[in-house]
A protein has these predicted regions:
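Asp-based, Mg2+/Mn2+-dependent phosphohydrolase catalytic module
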Residues: 1-10, 100, 116-117, 121-204
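N-terminal helical cap/lid subdomain that shapes the substrate entry/recognition surface
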Residues: 2-97, 116-118
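Flexible coil/turn residues that form the inter-helical turn or adjacent wing/linker of helix-turn-helix
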Residues: 63, 105, 172
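Residue-level marker of regulatory loop/turn positions in helix-turn-helix DNA-binding domains and
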Residues: 91, 112, 144
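Catalytic-core regions built around general acid/base machinery
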Residues: 94-106
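Short active-site oxyanion
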Residues: 106-110, 163-166
Length: 204
């Protein structure tokens, strides 16, 4: 149980936390391989395997999240392709109620995401997340992903917050680990970031 009297700042992840991760998973594993095959030619199944291998090689780095990087690497307009399936962008069922409650509280609410600005802008366009958030910060602004403890140091340097009185809600184990190592005291995660996938028993 969270002691809200002990929290001044709430740091919220976006993809998989406030928004259903199904959109992102569908885009990268199904829509992108199909459209790549249509544009560049080739067998979609083989292309899917090749793309997943290239993408997974960047996991945990800023490139993993960078639409400019993937547009350059794949010779595609990734943002335009993401718009093609933007109808799948959706908040989790409890998101709006949670955000309304936070807005009515004493807490300062920040969106802290690894999403590239192009992806972030698209999702803000298709949701009302921005109405409930006082600060929106992409890790691309700081040049380092949330998986790195240095990210949290830079975040605090730019926008002061007390880690001992902050809550981070995130669906990624490595992000929660880096935040804990930095000293963020209150951590919370979700058991089902993607509504089309099974509940997680743990973060491992």
């Amino acid at each position: 149980m969270i002691d809200w009297h002990a929290i001044d700042t709430v740091l919220l992840d976006m993809d998989g936390t406030l928004l259903d991760l199904h959109y992102d998973n569908f885009f990268w594993t199904q829509h992108l391989p199909r459209r790549y095959a249509e544009i560049h030619g080739g067998d979609p199944e083989r292309i899917n395997d090749q793309l997943m291998s290239r993408i997974m090689a960047e996991k945990g780095s800023l490139n993993w999240y960078c639409l400019d990087y993937w547009s350059d690497q794949l010779k595609l307009d990734i943002i335009a392709l993401k718009r093609e399936v933007a109808h799948l962008i959706a908040p989790h069922p409890s998101t709006n109620e949670f955000l309304h409650a936070l807005k009515a509280s004493h807490c300062d609410v920040w969106l802290v995401t690894n999403a590239h600005r192009g992806s972030l802008d698209l999702k803000l366009e298709h949701t009302d997340l921005g109405e409930h958030i006082s600060k929106i910060i992409s890790s691309h602004e700081l040049g380092i992903p949330k998986e790195d403890t240095e990210f949290w140091r830079k975040l605090q340097q730019h926008w002061h917050f007390d880690p001992t009185r902050s809550l981070l809600v995130d669906d990624t184990a490595s992000v929660l680990d880096s935040a804990a190592a930095f000293g963020i005291r209150h951590l919370l995660t979700l058991r089902q970031p993607d509504s089309k996938q099974a509940l997680r028993d743990s973060l491992t």
